[in-house]
Amino acid sequence: MKSSTLETQSKEINLHDDISSYAVPFDHHIIQKYGKKSFVWIGPIPRLNIMDPDMIRDILINYNTFHKPKGNFLLKLLVDGLAFEEGERWAKLRKILNPAFNLHKLKNMLPAIYLSCSEIVSKWETLISPTGSSEINVLPYLAYLSADVISRTAFGSSYEEGRRIFQLQKEQIQLILENSQSSYIPGWRFLPTKSNKKMKEINREIRAIVKDLISKREKKLKEGEMKTEDLLGMLLESNIKEIQESGNKKDAGITIDQVIEECKLFYFAGQETTSNLLAWTMVMLATHRNWQERAREEVFQVFGNNKPDFEGLNHLKVVTMILNEVLRLYPPVSMVSRKTYETTKLGDVTLPPGVEHLLHITFVHHDTELWGDDAKEFNPERFSQGVAKAVQKPNSYFPFGLGPRICIGQNLATIEAKMAVAMILQRFLFELSPSYLHGPQIRLTLQPRFGAHMILHKI
């Protein structure tokens, strides 16, 4: 599996090529050869490929039957918490987290998002030559932008500590990718290898930083000294409220360890998802200049040269269509998995316990039977009447998942993306650099393997 991926991704592909065979070559080969309802053995585990939207809906709606597989211990060094909890533990955690992600709370985060976006576009302006244009690999800047947004919105005034967490998480991702194959060797995690020691050391440092932030914030909240609008403050407030409403029962609320894991999840999911969405959006708009012009015209019509506001962002129809289409073509994750632990009926198939179900987001999003002959082409017009009318068969579009376990941070990611796109369009025209190489690669999330090199022109 790994060798086929490395061989396929050793060079770039054409911008108009099907990315599925490049990004996930092994699964693409299996589905092409054996069909959309095929299965393979991954060691002792039978893995069923799922591409039928009705089955996908049934699996994601019935979360008490179709469970998330127990996370690989390497992945759990990076993220845990809500992403992997099940049953009552998940329901309690989601209830405590929900208030922090409602639209009213997100609206109050807009100034922090604006500051992060402003810093990056100002930096780009200083990099552009006096002639009015320069080549820039925008990918690292967009990664910094998204990390900065999460630092500010998650930790508020403590965002410098948040930046340190981002640096550590970035290092951890690289180590996890380098050691992903070794993790299948029984007992490997207990060996005192250099990488194992380093990963555990990074995890300890991240936890120590977050624990210190939490302790300081809890102390101030209990003393009534501050009421914050960042995610950590709202999470702690919601947790205190949950404990008080339960009559201070011992098992009410969530533990400090759970709060730490949620903060780590904020970082990984928030930063990776949005930075890659912005990078692919710039690549698509640089390639399809007519859509770039339509989006810019809309942005100037709504905001002029003024600072984007919450109400205006909600009126950006063309920008929303573009982001939806980018998420269709380049979803943040290419697949989600579920597992059954008892005999289960799915459609007309009865499955034994222990089957893993792979729900292929990229393949479904690119399926010509669902989306038409232009399924692999960039055409935001398909979303002109909203997501529901973009495709004939429901549940064929799920970049953030479906059902009760849909991504809790999707609204934050969307608001951040709209703000960044609007501010970039206000200040720059951009096109692909001749040095741009197209290589959609999965490194936990789908990202441009060779960067995103653009020629930026000041407006």
Question: Where are the regions a protein language model picked out?
Answer:
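N-terminal membrane-proximal hinge/A-helix region immediately C-terminal to the signal-anchor transmembrane segment
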Residues: M1-E88, K92, Y114-K123, E160, ...
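Conserved cytochrome P450 K-helix E-x-x-R motif and the immediately C-terminal K′/meander segment
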Residues: E12-G35, A208, D212, N306-G347, ...
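Cytochrome P450 heme-thiolate monooxygenase catalytic core
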Residues: H67-L74, E85, R89, N108-N276, ...
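C-terminal helix/juxtamembrane-tail motif
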Residues: E237, L429, T445-I459
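Cytochrome P450 heme-thiolate "Cys pocket" and heme-binding signature region
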Residues: K264, A269, M335, F383-A417, ...
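Short, small-residue alpha-helix embedded
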Residues: T274-A286, A420
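Cytochrome P450 heme-binding "Cys pocket" and the immediately downstream C-terminal segment
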Residues: R289-Q292, Q410-Q447
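Conserved cytochrome P450 K-helix/beta-meander segment immediately N-terminal to the heme-binding cysteine loop
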Residues: L359-A388
